[in-house]
Amino acid sequence: MARMAAIGYSYGGSYSPDAKQIVFVSSGAGVPQVWRAVTDGVGLVQVTTFDDPVGGVLWSPAGEHLAVSVAPGGGLNTQIFLVPAQGGEPIQITEGGQVNNWLNEWSRDGRYLAYSSNAAGNGGMDCWLYDTESGAARMIAITDGIGSCQLSPDAQRAVVWRMQSRGNTNMYLLDLATSSEQLLTPHVGLALSNQAEFVNNDTLLLSTNIDREFVALARIDIAADGTPGPVNYIAGRDDADLDSFEMLADGKIALMWDAAGRSELAYLDLASGEVTAGPELPTEIAGGMDASPDRTMLTLSLSGSASPTNVWQLDTSSGVFTQISDSAHEGVDLDTLVRPELMTYTAHDGLELSGWLYRARVTGSTEGAPPMVLNFHGGPEGQS
């Protein structure tokens, strides 16, 4: 068990502007830090040497900076630093202390960094914008609880995501010049709206399950006067939730489905509406998709029953995966690990449920029950 618990991990790949390098977080040095690799998976170099663990990294589209989140003492009061991409001293841009801060995203020109912070002291994770030219940060949206934001290509608008309550979220269209907001996701009862991305300044894609059971991909068009239109579904499944999506070249969208706890990749052609299956993933679980600047390549954080979490690259044209990182697993022979079986069963109220069963390899005496581990997840939104 100790050897299993010590297995390393790498995740959160982010491309350089020329797509020749990828930065990511890895536990390879013991304390998680930022590492860099060229995109053929060789030449791994440790970039940061913080005393505290790094939680995430985003390479600026302008190329000059890495935005890095660091957790002092491994706690919740995460701080954000700008690390010179070509080497140099990190600059802390958040105030430190008991303030919590989360990375959101860079503007497409690399001037602004959007992040969430409770620095205002109102109890919520508000949306902030840091200007790399002036070195100043300003709050752009107030949130009572958990919140984040995504910027339009011209950085004149943003989508503000807010958690209303457990299992219930909303998105709002924010005009940064006037600070006015318009609700994008009106609904009755509970609904999850998880991810939003601007296709252009006037078109939004989002994942949501408003008026349906499973999360799907939807589109919202913004009129010339700034008024958002209705939620229009453009890709969905009756047996899987849309876990994440990423815009690709030639008007295509990469869709990552969660089908009974296993990830499945597909591609949507925005013009025709056709959805085609993507290549089979090297492992069972995928997360953290990020597209290269030319949107022909993807980084993914892949893990599985016999695979530590690693950063991979997918060439979307050829369908070829390349492993970028190599998470340590000393003393653990991955080939001997049990692969699970998908099992379905009926609950007491007749609802069909599913889960992954790991059958213990029984050696020696067969007397008595084999060893068993029960893994309970923490809420209705997640799966274990």
Predicted regions: what they are:
Residues 288-384:
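Serine-hydrolase catalytic core recognition
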Residues 56, 103, 123, 366-369, ...:
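Alpha-helix N-cap/helix-start motif
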Residues 21, 25-46, 64-65, 70-92, ...:
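Beta-propeller blade-edge and WD-like acidic-aromatic loop motif
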Residues 1-9, 42-44:
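A short helix->beta-strand "capping" segment at the edge of beta-propeller domains
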Residues 6-25, 51-70, 80, 97-116, ...:
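Conserved beta-propeller blade repeats
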Residues 73, 100, 120, 363, ...:
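Short strand->helix junction
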Residues 1-4, 203, 372:
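Short intrinsically disordered, low-complexity coil segments enriched in acidic
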Residues 40, 50-53, 96, 133, ...:
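Short, solvent-exposed coil/turn elements at secondary-structure transition points
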